[in-house]
Amino acid sequence: MAVKIKRDDQVIVITGKDKGKTGTIKTVLSNGKIIIEGVNTVKKHQKPNPQADVAGGIIEQSAPMQISNVAILNSATGKADRVGFRLEDGKKVRFFKSNNELVK
């Protein structure tokens, strides 16, 4: 099955503690999870490492979340939408199912 959500897509969280938040996908992991900028943030306790010039402390970073918990955001309507595939000029392209516009 083809991947309907890719890197740099605008998505909206549809379930969980961050429901309703939007962001851009930074990474798509192979185990069915994604990392979204500014969503699902966790606090990590970082040990100082003088050899790598890394200061210690508590840092916030985005944690992976299930790809099924997000939907792609349609920029024309501002709402969550479903994605389909079709052939145009011999290339497989993604489109929004609500208004048949291509995903940019």
Swiss-Prot record:
Family annotation (HAMAP family): Ribosomal_uL24_B (MF_01326_B)
Task performed by this protein: One of two assembly initiator proteins, it binds directly to the 5'-end of the 23S rRNA, where it nucleates assembly of the 50S subunit. One of the proteins that surrounds the polypeptide exit tunnel on the outside of the subunit.
Keyword annotations: Ribonucleoprotein, Ribosomal protein, RNA-binding, rRNA-binding
Protein name in the entry: Large ribosomal subunit protein uL24
GO biological process, alphabetically ordered: translation
Gene: rplX
Segments traversing the membrane: none
Chain coiled-coil ranges: none
SUBUNIT field: Part of the 50S ribosomal subunit.
GO CC terms: ribonucleoprotein complex; ribosome
Molecular functions (GO terms): rRNA binding; structural constituent of ribosome
CDD domains (UniProt xref): KOW_RPL26 (cd06089)
Disulfide topology: none
Family the UniProt entry places it in: Belongs to the universal ribosomal protein uL24 family.
Domain of life: Bacteria
SMART domains per the UniProt record, alphabetical: KOW
One Pfam family, short name: ribosomal_L24
